[in-house]
């Protein structure tokens, strides 16, 4: 049986695509997992994948700090190599981030194929530095193709969990009514700035007849301060596929994973890029969706309540039965999301891995 080591760690943007690939191959392949201690993978990776954690970090800084980081990278690579040898691994799959560097180096050390998947339009530092040493590089968005030196990336899209690809019911706790459903998502790390923007606009939208589901993330001190029968605030939900499939409009950060989930659900979106994202990659991700007419971009530094509120009102004008609404822009946005979607990304990646295993 072919043995695959997955190296994915940190945020949902790295973990969820890797989990989708693991689910796609586990009937035919034996899957193991390597991550970093005290990160999200310790909660999300199923026990059957036998998570092994190694200490890995970034390569920022200069002088002594850089030397210490290089030493830690070497030690992490040795640990991953040990896991490869112990489990007789045939191939490595990684989604970037801190754990990707030792995984790529260890795979090269052991002379086994390694596939790197980059979800973002602007590749991360590890992808830019080490993509040339991988057996294959796959990308989620076309804009990344010319930004990975020394490689010829394959466009596969970004994998999503299987529940996004099959019809899901609307969660029973969603407010009932005839008004349009607006779903707000801050991502796996939450979004304080986005929450503030949304809360400034929500009272008016509720007054006009919207139903609102707001997933705030863990670090939100103001949850449930606003009470309304058509508003539900939760820190997290494991029923996001059902929410997005039934939503009329979503407000979201512009992580590549979130955009991929919106796309396969054909959910029109207002994207608010995280302004501190590395290399402004969320801005570039949002631009890819907006170029297809699938999304509208609102920036966090813009006057918060008027811009976001007016954008949502314009997009929902027909459903809110506003008298000056002429046509429904949501239909065209759904078509844009459908054009952006890659519904078989995990199968494409599984096939790519299979071609590389001798």
From Swiss-Prot:
UDP-N-acetyl-alpha-D-glucosamine binds at residues 11-13, 120, 161, 188, 282. InterPro entries: GlcNAc_MurG (IPR006009), Glyco_trans_28_C (IPR007235), GlycoTrans_28_N (IPR004276). Its EC number is 2.4.1.227. SUPFAM superfamilies: UDP-Glycosyltransferase/glycogen phosphorylase (SSF53756). It catalyses: di-trans,octa-cis-undecaprenyl diphospho-N-acetyl-alpha-D-muramoyl-L-alanyl-D-glutamyl-meso-2,6-diaminopimeloyl-D-alanyl-D-alanine + UDP-N-acetyl-alpha-D-glucosamine = di-trans,octa-cis-undecaprenyl diphospho-[N-acetyl-alpha-D-glucosaminyl-(1->4)]-N-acetyl-alpha-D-muramoyl-L-alanyl-D-glutamyl-meso-2,6-diaminopimeloyl-D-alanyl-D-alanine + UDP + H(+). PANTHER family: GLYCOSYLTRANSFERASE, UDP-N-ACETYLGLUCOSAMINE--N-ACETYLMURAMYL-(PENTAPEPTIDE) PYROPHOSPHORYL-UNDECAPRENOL N-ACETYLGLUCOSAMINE TRANSFERASE 1. Cell wall formation. Catalyzes the transfer of a GlcNAc subunit on undecaprenyl-pyrophosphoryl-MurNAc-pentapeptide (lipid intermediate I) to form undecaprenyl-pyrophosphoryl-MurNAc-(pentapeptide)GlcNAc (lipid intermediate II). This is UDP-N-acetylglucosamine--N-acetylmuramyl-(pentapeptide) pyrophosphoryl-undecaprenol N-acetylglucosamine transferase.
């Amino acid at each position: 049986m072919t043995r695959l080591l997955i190296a994915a760690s940190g945020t949902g943007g790295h973990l969820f695509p890797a989990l989708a690939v693991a689910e796609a191959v586990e009937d035919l392949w034996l899957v193991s997992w390597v991550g970093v201690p005290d990160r999200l993978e310790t909660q999300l990776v199923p026990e059957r994948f036998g998570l092994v954690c190694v200490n890995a970090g970034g390569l920022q800084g200069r002088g002594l700090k850089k030397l210490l980081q290089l030493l830690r990278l070497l030690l992490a690579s040795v640990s991953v190599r040990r896991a490869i040898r112990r489990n007789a691994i045939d191939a490595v799959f990684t989604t970037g981030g801190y754990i990707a560097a030792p995984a790529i180096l260890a795979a090269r050390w052991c002379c086994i194929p390694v596939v790197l998947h980059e979800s973002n339009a602007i590749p991360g530092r590890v992808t830019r530095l080490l993509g040339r040493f991988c057996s294959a590089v796959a990308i989620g968005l076309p804009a990344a193709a010319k930004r990975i030196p020394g490689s010829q990336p394959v466009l596969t899209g970004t994998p999503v969990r299987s529940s996004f690809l099959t019809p899901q019911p609307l969660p029973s706790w969603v407010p009932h009514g005839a008004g349009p459903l607006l779903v707000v998502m801050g991502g796996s790390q939450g979004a304080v700035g986005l929450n503030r923007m949304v809360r400034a606009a929500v009272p008016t939208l509720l007054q006009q007849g919207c139903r609102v589901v707001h997933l705030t993330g863990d670090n939100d001190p103001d949850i449930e301060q606003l009470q309304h029968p058509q508003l539900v605030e939760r820190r997290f939900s494991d029923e996001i596929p059902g929410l997005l499939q039934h939503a009329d409009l979503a407000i979201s950060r512009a992580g590549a994973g979130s955009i991929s989930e919106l796309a396969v659900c054909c959910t029109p979106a207002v994207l608010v890029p995280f302004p501190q994202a590395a290399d402004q990659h969320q801005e570039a991700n949002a631009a890819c969706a907006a170029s297809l007419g699938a999304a509208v971009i609102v920036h966090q530094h813009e006057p918060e309540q008027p811009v976001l509120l007016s954008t949502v009102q314009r997009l929902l004008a027909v459903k809110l039965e506003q008298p000056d609404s002429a046509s429904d822009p949501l239909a065209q946005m759904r078509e844009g999301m459908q054009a952006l979607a890659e519904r078989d990304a995990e199968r494409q990646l599984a096939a790519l891995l299979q071609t590389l295993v001798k």
